Amino acid sequence: MERRRITSARRSYASSETMVRGHGPTRHLGTIPRLSLSRMTPPLPARVDFSLAGALNAGFKETRASERAEMMELNDRFASYIEKVRFLEQQNKALAAELNQLRAKEPTKLADVYQAELRELRLRLDQLTTNSARLEVERDNLTQDLGTLRQKLQDETNLRLEAENNLAVYRQEADEATLARVDLERKVESLEEEIQFLRKIHEEEVRELQEQLAQQQVHVEMDVAKPDLTAALREIRTQYEAVATSNMQETEEWYRSKFADLTDVASRNAELLRQAKHEANDYRRQLQALTCDLESLRGTNESLERQMREQEERHARESASYQEALARLEEEGQSLKEEMARHLQEYQDLLNVKLALDIEIATYRKLLEGEENRITIPVQTFSNLQIRETSLDTKSVSEGHLKRNIVVKTVEMRDGEVIKESKQEHKDVM
């Protein structure tokens, strides 16, 4: 039964050894502690005393019973270790498959997703930059047109102010001409009144003289001829009338000339005033048209500025959303990297556990082989013992592979003394 258990344990170890393979960073595991079988079989002398055979047989039976119990316990532990190794191998395979899947698919897929989204984001950013540049060019053109229209409006305003100033001057000249005409009319009226007054005075003087002549009836008889007073008065009257007529004619001629001059000036001023009013109306219409154009351009400019602000705000929002998306993707990538690192760490830990279990299994196998060899050796040859020391050293050959060196050290002892020692090295690549 013990042999069957050992054979089944060997078979289980062989099957598990063929299944256990892994990849991961190397780690120096050191050497396995030296194993000694001196505690199980005490050294025997070279010559056997047959008188002590019974005692030796009794001691051997007790030793065999204790060794059998110890082997059963070790066998049970070995079976539990094998079950644990199988369970860990299954987990190792699942983790290795998941790791290979992550290595094969996730980075490439994630990189493709990143590249596609980055290309889309760059394309949209280029479009937004182009639209922004186009809107800036349109805004600059509209600003230039607005400056030109403002300059034209300023020129037209200056012309309107100049026309208003000329109109004010013309109005002042017309007022002055009106005042001059009124003054001349007043002077003509005063001259007519003066002529009437002088005529009345002259008539009164003539009447007084006639009355005086009628009252005085002086008859002077002289040798000379009598003077003709009526002729003298008539002559005086004629002279006064001639003077008055000439004065009136001169006054009328001067009044007519002045009135004609004032009429010409007034007509010219009226024509200039009419032209100024016409020009003012034209300027007013042009000013209204330019004001309407300016208002429309202001509305267009405000609309374009509003659209530009909306575009900038939308661009800022989209940029913020893209930045958030990039940050989120980077966080997801970082979390995936951390998860991958965690899986790798777990895989490394499981690999270390597996290597430790492999070492322990190898140790138990060596113990079992030594036990089988000791069982097959006759009693009289118990003085020759072989102790093997196994050490494992793992060195990194390349990434993803482990190189395991198994050193088997054989020591032959007789009477507690080392008489022969040999060492064998086996290389195993995992």
Curated annotation (Swiss-Prot):
Region (Coil 2A): 229-250
Record SUPFAM superfamilies: Intermediate filament protein, coiled coil region
PTM-bearing positions, type Citrulline: 34, 268, 404, 414
Record region (Tail): 376-430
Residue(s) carrying Omega-N-methylarginine: 11, 21
Location of region: Coil 2B: 255-375
Chief subcellular location: cytoplasm
Keyword Ion transport appears in the UniProt entry: no
A Gene Ontology term for the protein's cellular component: cell projection
Region (Coil 1A) residue spans: 71-102
Biased composition (Polar residues): 9-18
Keyword Transcription carried by entry: no
Subunit structure: Interacts with SYNM.
Similarity section: Belongs to the intermediate filament family.
Function: GFAP, a class-III intermediate filament, is a cell-specific marker that, during the development of the central nervous system, distinguishes astrocytes from other glial cells.
Protein name per its UniProtKB record: Glial fibrillary acidic protein
